[in-house]
UniProtKB/Swiss-Prot annotation:
It is found in: Secreted. It comes from Poecilotheria metallica. The modification Phenylalanine amide is found at F33. InterPro entries: Huwentoxin-1. It comes from the Eukaryota. Keywords: Amidation, Disulfide bond, Ion channel impairing toxin, Knottin, Neurotoxin, Secreted, Toxin, Voltage-gated sodium channel impairing toxin. The lineage of its organism: Eukaryota, Metazoa, Ecdysozoa, Arthropoda, Chelicerata. GO terms for molecular function: ion channel inhibitor activity; sodium channel regulator activity; toxin activity. The presence of a 'disulfide through disulfide knot' structurally defines this protein as a knottin. Gating-modifier toxin with very weak activity on Nav1.7/SCN9A and Nav1.8/SCN10A. Shows 22% peak current inhibition (at 10 uM) on Nav1.8/SCN10A sodium channels. Show peak current inhibition and delays fast inactivation on Nav1.7/SCN9A (EC(50)>10 uM). This is Mu/delta-theraphotoxin-Pm2a. Disulfide bonds join C2-C16, C9-C21, C15-C27. Its main location: secreted. GO terms for cellular component: extracellular region.
Length: 33
């Protein structure tokens, strides 16, 4: 599965759709809809 909002990540690929891996290593909104 994918990592949901505020979940920990290593790369953008770890995160669910419309999320990206922020520099503090959690998934946040990537600005897309």
């Amino acid at each position: 599965g994918c990592t949901k909002f505020m979940g920990s990540c290593k790369t953008d690929a770890d995160c669910c759709e419309h999320l990206e891996c922020y520099k503090y290593k959690w998934c946040g909104w990537d600005g897309t809809f």
